[in-house]
Amino acid sequence: MPKQITEIKDFLVLARRKDAKIVKIKKNSLNVKFKVRCSRYLFTLVVNDKDKAEKLKQSLPPGIQVIELK
């Protein structure tokens, strides 16, 4: 089941969880969506600022698999 997150700090905490498997980054013309797959939920964070999205991408934990879509 999907859940939406509004805070970047909450997303980073979720990405560092032990059951977080993969992060998908989906870019379109208006915003960037970060989707982290955990064992029970798919958490989504929508970022409207491209610079913040790039910083968030660089601050993801190194052990997690990252896939960029479009």
UniProtKB/Swiss-Prot annotation:
What Gene Ontology biological process does one annotation of this record name? translation
Record has ATP-binding as a keyword: no
Keywords carried by this UniProt record: Ribonucleoprotein, Ribosomal protein
Q: Name one GO cellular component term.
A: cytosolic large ribosomal subunit
Q: Name one GO molecular function term.
A: structural constituent of ribosome
Membership in a protein family: Belongs to the eukaryotic ribosomal protein eL38 family.
Q: What protein is this chain from? A: Large ribosomal subunit protein eL38
Q: Which organism is it from?
A: Ostertagia ostertagi (Brown stomach worm)
